[in-house]
Amino acid sequence: MSINTLKNKKQINRLFKKGKTSIFFPLMFYCIESKEPKVLFSISKKKIAKAVERNKLKRQLKAIYVEDFSWNLNKHLAIVYLANYVCDAIELKEAMQKIKDTYEKD
């Protein structure tokens, strides 16, 4: 399964301004209804300085998303990494599971 990524600047701005926000450390989620599901992964250079570490985290987040987020229908989703350190995959998966449980209730 491939990931349909969110790239349109207007859609990204709308998501961050009007989207529903949830924080499950080390991740922050923005979610808004849309016609087709798209996802955005964001990790700040200020928090994780080394590109190798940022890319590894993004790969881990994408793998978890593909594995567990088949429920994400008709929503744009932004996943923002908040921690100042590199988390392990288990911690990321737990945060993603919490957000999945939260949005399945809606």
What function would you assign to each model-found segment?
Residues 1-106:
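Positively charged, solvent-exposed patches that mediate nucleic-acid binding
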